[in-house]
Regions:
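Hydrophobic transmembrane alpha-helices
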Residues: 1-56
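Small-polar-interrupted transmembrane alpha-helices in polytopic inner-membrane proteins
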Residues: 19, 23, 61-66
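Membrane-embedded alpha-helical hairpins and interfacial helices in multi-pass inner-membrane proteins
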Residues: 27-35, 43, 63-160
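Interfacial helix-start motif at the membrane-water boundary
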Residues: 47-54, 58-62, 71, 75
Length: 160
């Protein structure tokens, strides 16, 4: 049992570190925040299909990334909540991989626009931000996440 706990903790920590690293990489190119967001780290949101440790790993990774990027507290709280909800939904839909991509896309598309509008006061409307955030999520989570899923699924017996 102790080995499984250590393995679970290690997997979660590695996923959190990857999430932070990919978010910081996106920040270097100005893709991680603002009206149009393309967080490369969101591709990792498919990982709960393979690993239960991905749920806390993604959540902690998002929390740390938001703190390290200097986001305001409401973004840290609600952005992390959106990631947690998406990760839990993905885990629950792990036997339906195409549907498993939807929870993180939907949670971020619904929650993040309110943060952009009311916490940051960015010019634009909630529906506009739903469109822009949703598009970014479709690319990062839907497209890149699907590519990651296809790659990992071929080798899941060796990896997991």
């Amino acid at each position: 049992m102790k080995h499984n706990n250590t393995k679970h903790l290690t997997q979660g920590a590695v996923i959190a570190a990857l999430y932070v690293a990919l978010t910081l990489l996106a920040k270097v190119f100005g893709l991680d925040s603002g009206q149009i967001q393309l967080r490369l780290s969101e591709a990792l949101c498919i990982l709960p299909v393979f690993l239960p440790a991905a749920v806390p790993g993604l959540t902690v990774g998002c929390l740390l990334a938001n703190l390290l990027c200097g986001n305001i507290i409401w973004d840290v709280v609600f952005g992390t909540l959106a990631t947690l909800l998406g990760a839990v939904g993905t885990r629950l839909l792990r036997n339906r991989p195409l549907l498993a991509l939807l929870p993180p896309i939907l949670s971020n598309t619904v929650i993040v626009p309110f943060v952009l509008t009311y916490a940051y006061g960015l010019p634009g409307t909630v529906p506009f931000f739903m469109l822009t955030v949703g598009l970014g999520e479709l690319i990062s989570c839907g497209l890149l996440g699907r590519l990651l899923y296809n790659t990992l699924d071929k080798h899941k017996n060796q990896l997991f």
